[in-house]
Every structure is written in C-alpha cells, then in structure tokens.
C-alpha cells in the first residue's frame, strides 16, 4: 500500500550479544588481578625471575585479549549504527560486515601498545615496588639476619596513612594520574560527594596539584596492601 513504510530490520538480538561481550571484560580484569597476585607471591617467596617474567607474558596476553575484545565490540557497534542509518529492509550478512570492519581496525595494531594497557602499567609498577622492598631487605645490615623471613622493609607510618582519614589504610588504592594513595572507601565517598555538588575534586595529598580526580583514575595498590598485611601480621605476633 502506498504511504506505508516497509519494516526495518531489528538489531535487538545484536544488542543483547553486545551486552554479553561487554560483560566479558570483567572476566578479563579478574584474570589480570589473579595474575598480579601470583606474580607478587612469586617475588615474595624468592622464586626465579623467569617465573615472574612468565606472569608478565600472561598479563600481555590478557592485554591483547582485552584489546581484541574492545575492537570487536567497536566493529559491531560501528556496523550496526551504519545499517540503522540506512534503514535496511532486508537482513544483511552482518557477520561478514563486522569481520571486514574488525580486520580493518586490527591492521593498525602494534603489540608494543599492549605495554601501555593501564592494568599492565600498574602491574609493572607493583612489581617494581615489591622488588624495591625486597632489594632493600637484602641489603640491610647484619642486625636483621635473625628477623622473621615474613618481615619486609616497610614504608614509614606516614606512607601508610590515608590523607583523608589520617588512619592506617586497610584497602589502599592509587591514583593513576598523580600516584598518590588513599583508603578506597574514603576517596570514593569524597569524589562522589564533590561530584554530586557539581564540583571538581582535588587530590587530598598535601602539595599535590592534581585537581580533577575521577573514580576511574583509581586502581588497587596491591603491593602496598601486601605490605600492610605483613605489618599487621607482625603486630599480631607481639
């Protein structure tokens, strides 16, 4: 009949699949967190550096999977948006179109960029911090020879104190932008409260000039958390 528009292809099933794919990112992040924990365990117990290097390779593999997943999701979203604009009446070969778009995106990949993944960068920082602590312990004077092997060289009490609560941290998170550390619950509450008032959030560390904090900037400070746990373990023995 004239004046009656033809039905447009529905992409609701594609939207559902996209939602499932995005949920997979959480599984990748869990795998990365486990890898970080294993690597720090290996360092703490004095395992060979080759075993720690193997964990670094695992982290790079996770980084590659995360990159590929994000690019595939982007390819699907771009393709679907294009088809929606064209209001197609017949079901296209969506899989072929997505694969073509995905292949185009992947041509620009450089595996060196995997080392810039936020979680991989944080992983390297945590290994560096743990190695620094272990190295300081090994170079200590003879007075420490009989100290329990679980004791690590610990940072000063000031470095364990949250700049917001002024109490020793139990669940520290680090700001990726400025590198300062806070108690997770305290800093997240502070950011949320300020954002609700439409105000920018300045890093609470005295002297820090970073003035636009976001919750997405915060990552677990696993190395410091392990140090705090060791300290508390030692306190419990006395």
Swiss-Prot record:
GO biological process: cell division; cellular senescence; double-strand break repair via homologous recombination; positive regulation of maintenance of mitotic sister chromatid cohesion; positive regulation of mitotic metaphase/anaphase transition; protein sumoylation; telomere maintenance via recombination
Pfam families named in the record: zf-Nse
Keyword line: Cell cycle, Cell division, Chromosome, DNA damage, DNA recombination, DNA repair, Metal-binding, Mitosis, Nucleus, Telomere, Transferase, Ubl conjugation pathway, Zinc, Zinc-finger
Ranges annotated as SP-RING-type zinc finger: 147-233
Chain residues that bind Zn(2+): 178, 180, 203, 208
Gene3D superfamilies membership: Zinc/RING finger domain, C3HC4 (zinc finger)
Highest taxon, organism lineage: Eukaryota
Enzyme class at the top of the EC tree: transferase
Localization in the cell: Nucleus; Chromosome, Telomere
Listed transmembrane segments: none
Coiled-coil parts of chain: none
Entry EC no(s): 2.3.2.-
Pathway in which this enzyme or protein is active: Protein modification; protein sumoylation
MF GO annotations: SUMO ligase activity; SUMO transferase activity; zinc ion binding
CC annotations in GO: chromosome, telomeric region; nucleus; PML body; Smc5-Smc6 complex
Assembly and interaction partners: Component of the SMC5-SMC6 complex which consists at least of smc5, smc6, nsmce2, nsmce1 and nsmce4a.
Family in the record: Belongs to the NSE2 family.
Role played: E3 SUMO-protein ligase component of the SMC5-SMC6 complex, a complex involved in repair of DNA double-strand breaks by homologous recombination. Is not be required for the stability of the complex. The complex may promote sister chromatid homologous recombination by recruiting the SMC1-SMC3 cohesin complex to double-strand breaks. The complex is required for telomere maintenance via recombination and mediates sumoylation of shelterin complex (telosome) components. Required for recruitment of telomeres to PML nuclear bodies.
Protein name per UniProt: E3 SUMO-protein ligase NSE2
Classification of source organism: Eukaryota, Metazoa, Chordata, Craniata, Vertebrata
């Amino acid at each position: 009949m004239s004046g009656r528009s033809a039905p447009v292809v529905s992409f609701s099933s594609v939207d559902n699949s996209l939602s499932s794919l995005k949920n997979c990112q959480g599984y990748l992040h869990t795998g990365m967190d486990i890898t970080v924990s294993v690597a720090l365990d290996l360092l703490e117990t004095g395992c060979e550096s080759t075993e720690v290097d193997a964990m670094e390779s695992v982290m790079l593999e996770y980084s590659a999977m995360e990159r590929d997943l994000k690019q595939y999701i982007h390819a699907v979203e771009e393709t679907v948006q294009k088809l929606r604009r064209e209001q197609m009446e017949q079901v296209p070969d969506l899989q072929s179109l997505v694969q073509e778009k995905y292949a185009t995106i992947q041509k620009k990949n450089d595996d060196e960029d995997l080392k810039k993944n936020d979680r991989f960068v944080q992983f390297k920082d945590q290994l560096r911090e743990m190695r620094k602590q272990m190295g300081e312990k090994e170079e200590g004077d003879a007075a420490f020879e009989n100290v329990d092997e679980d004791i690590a060289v610990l940072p000063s009490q000031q470095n364990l104190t949250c700049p917001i609560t002024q109490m020793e941290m139990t669940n520290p998170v680090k700001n990726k932008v400025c590198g300062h550390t806070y108690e997770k619950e305290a800093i997240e509450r502070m950011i949320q409260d300020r954002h609700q008032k439409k105000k920018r959030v300045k890093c609470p560390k005295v002297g820090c000039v970073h003035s636009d904090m976001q919750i997405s900037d915060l990552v677990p400070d696993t190395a410091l958390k392990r140090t705090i746990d060791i300290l508390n373990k030692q306190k419990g023995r006395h």
